[in-house]
Amino acid sequence: MVTLNHYLILSSLLFMIGLVGVMRRKNLLMLFFSTEIMLNAVNVGLVAAGKYMNDMAGQMFSFFIIAVAASEVAVGLGLLILWYKKNGSLDLDNLQLMKG
């Protein structure tokens, strides 16, 4: 049987994978994807905790996070596309060019 510990271990592993991706990648798109992995890891933890506590709050918070992540995807990908069209690269080191 799958217990709460299994879900929390999965959630923490996913979060660590996303955190390593955020710290090690220089491509803005990969940073964006790593952030999404971290948000989904939090969702797994919230849903699992809500299931084992017989409380719907975890699922409700998870739906709220999904809604926020969807708007983040819409705005973030739009900005990344514009950045790529302007500079031809999504390298994080080129972000210094935005200084006034």
Curated annotation (Swiss-Prot):
Q: What biological-process GO terms show up in the record?
A: ATP synthesis coupled electron transport
Listed InterPro entries: NADH_UbQ_OxRdtase_chain4L/K, NUOK/Mnh_C1-like
Q: What is its EC number?
A: 7.1.1.-
A GO cellular component entry from the record? NADH dehydrogenase complex
The record's subcellular location field reads: Cell inner membrane
What the entry lists under Gene3D superfamilies is as follows: 1.10.287.3510
Q: What is its main location?
A: membrane
Keywords attached to this entry: Cell inner membrane, Cell membrane, Membrane, NAD, Quinone, Translocase, Transmembrane, Transmembrane helix, Transport, Ubiquinone
Gene Ontology MF, one: NADH:ubiquinone reductase (non-electrogenic) activity
Please describe what this protein does: NDH-1 shuttles electrons from NADH, via FMN and iron-sulfur (Fe-S) centers, to quinones in the respiratory chain. The immediate electron acceptor for the enzyme in this species is believed to be ubiquinone. Couples the redox reaction to proton translocation (for every two electrons transferred, four hydrogen ions are translocated across the cytoplasmic membrane), and thus conserves the redox energy in a proton gradient.
Protein name per Swiss-Prot or TrEMBL? NADH-quinone oxidoreductase subunit K
The protein's gene is named: nuoK
